[in-house]
């Protein structure tokens, strides 16, 4: 159990059968009446955000999460197989469990997988990864002045918008949180 007074950004709690992460919190002490804690909670499973108010000192069940460092080894019949880097056990995850980050997975990539009561809650990819451009329109000389972008398909099949000067075969850095181009990789 954790007191609402001990809430911090990133704290995970169990509420109404779901696991929630505290995104924002504010301790309020009104001039009249008792103190309370106003929070913004994000569901770890669905991503929904709700605002909830707790009485000061209210006890809430804290969610115990386990974080494992796993390495993506191969894909078997649509499932992604990962190996635990410490125990060498294999774990198979579906693309639904991985989420939108599945399009960036390549063999040998290490990810953090968060478990709650033995169930996968979240797969955390590295914030930026380096991938090879396999398909894009050729750049035309003089196009760079406008600052435009064009679609490019990467080695994993993911599609991102890149500047016009990027060509096939180049290695680029991509932000996995918002699918944006970060720069060339030397």
Swiss-Prot record:
GO terms, molecular function: translation elongation factor activity
SUPFAM superfamilies linked to this entry: Nucleic acid-binding proteins, Translation proteins SH3-like domain
InterPro entries: Elong-fact-P_C, NA-bd_OB-fold, Rib_uL2_dom2, Transl_elong_fac_P/YeiP, Transl_elong_KOW-like, Transl_elong_P/YeiP_cen, Transl_elong_P/YeiP_CS, Transl_elongation_fac_P
Protein name: Elongation factor P
Pfam families tied to this protein: EFP, EFP_N, Elong-fact-P_C
Subcellular location: Cytoplasm
Database matches in CDD domains: S1_EF-P_repeat_1, S1_EF-P_repeat_2
Superkingdom assignment: Bacteria
